[in-house]
Amino acid sequence: MNSVLRYSRSKNLKLIWNFTLLFVSLQVINDSNMEEVHNSAQLIELIDRIGFLPLLDSGIHGFSAEDIVAADCRYVVFPEGGWDWPLWKWKGSIITEGHHVYGKFFAGKAGFISREWWPDFCNYRRNKHPEPDEGSIEEAILLTLAEQGSLITRELRALCGFTGPKMRSKFDGYVTRLQMATRIVTEDFVYPIDRHNNEYGWGWSLLTTPEQLYGRDANLCNRTPEESFARICAHMHTVCPYATDAQIQKMLR
């Protein structure tokens, strides 16, 4: 009998918690004036308005592109095989047509930043992560990109000499840290083509530096790094009024 009661209580608590998360997610969307998104044009407009948007889970319930898009735009696996994920396919057009910045900026996870907010974000992050040391692997990666212009990840990895076993994840770690430092961004996504001339697969990130993609002036900011960070945090509280200081700072740091 006691075990049945414990199971029932546990199940009820789980249901309450799930409803709480759903309520918070809806509140984040409603209080931020964020309507459900059905296409890339709407998502471009939303990023223009709110400035920052992680692609997937941000640690703030309801605040990600995956949370905001309509159900038929999310990841689905078909019973007969194959998959579809409209949101994933929009990333390239959001960068190239919406001119938003994309990379692993939020606690090592991918997301979008509007060009309006990029100077403040870049100002804060580059102060926190100074230029790589001379002779370091990070410097070699940036010099290779400066020389080549833009490269998909596997090409960049090969040119930097990371060709041995277990080198892929190690190299990806360096690239992620450089994205967190706003030294590398994604220019577009490149997809393999099948024999029917159709794109397929997850695609490869075409990496470059923000200076090459947007010009050096795009990074300039007339505030101190501390002022930029305070400005971003204050703005995020208007976008996500139900988020705590700790949640926002964890996402941004």
Regions found by a protein language model. Name each.
Residues M1-S3, M34:
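Accessible peptide chain termini
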